[in-house]
From Swiss-Prot:
Organism name: Thunnus obesus (Bigeye tuna)
Record's bilayer topology term: Peripheral membrane protein
Lineage: Eukaryota, Metazoa, Chordata, Craniata, Vertebrata
Subunit record text: Component of the cytochrome c oxidase (complex IV, CIV), a multisubunit enzyme composed of 14 subunits. The complex is composed of a catalytic core of 3 subunits MT-CO1, MT-CO2 and MT-CO3, encoded in the mitochondrial DNA, and 11 supernumerary subunits COX4I, COX5A, COX5B, COX6A, COX6B, COX6C, COX7A, COX7B, COX7C, COX8 and NDUFA4, which are encoded in the nuclear genome.
Function of the protein: Component of the cytochrome c oxidase, the last enzyme in the mitochondrial electron transport chain which drives oxidative phosphorylation. The respiratory chain contains 3 multisubunit complexes succinate dehydrogenase (complex II, CII), ubiquinol-cytochrome c oxidoreductase (cytochrome b-c1 complex, complex III, CIII) and cytochrome c oxidase (complex IV, CIV), that cooperate to transfer electrons derived from NADH and succinate to molecular oxygen, creating an electrochemical gradient over the inner membrane that drives transmembrane transport and the ATP synthase.
GO terms assigned for molecular function: metal ion binding
Pathway: Energy metabolism; oxidative phosphorylation
Any GO CC annotation of this UniProt entry: respiratory chain complex IV
The protein's name in its UniProt record: Cytochrome c oxidase subunit 5A-2, mitochondrial
Cellular location(s): Mitochondrion inner membrane
One GO term (biological process): mitochondrial electron transport, cytochrome c to oxygen
Family: Belongs to the cytochrome c oxidase subunit 5A family.
Keywords: Heme, Iron, Membrane, Metal-binding, Mitochondrion, Mitochondrion inner membrane
Superkingdom, taxonomy of origin: Eukaryota
């Protein structure tokens, strides 16, 4: 068991990358 902070940070980072990659 890790924590919600780690998942939240990873999720945020992935979301940012996704937006940056799919920035039309």
């Amino acid at each position: 068991s890790h924590g919600k902070q780690e998942t939240d940070e990873e999720f945020d980072a992935r979301w940012v990358t996704y937006f940056n990659k799919s920035d039309i």
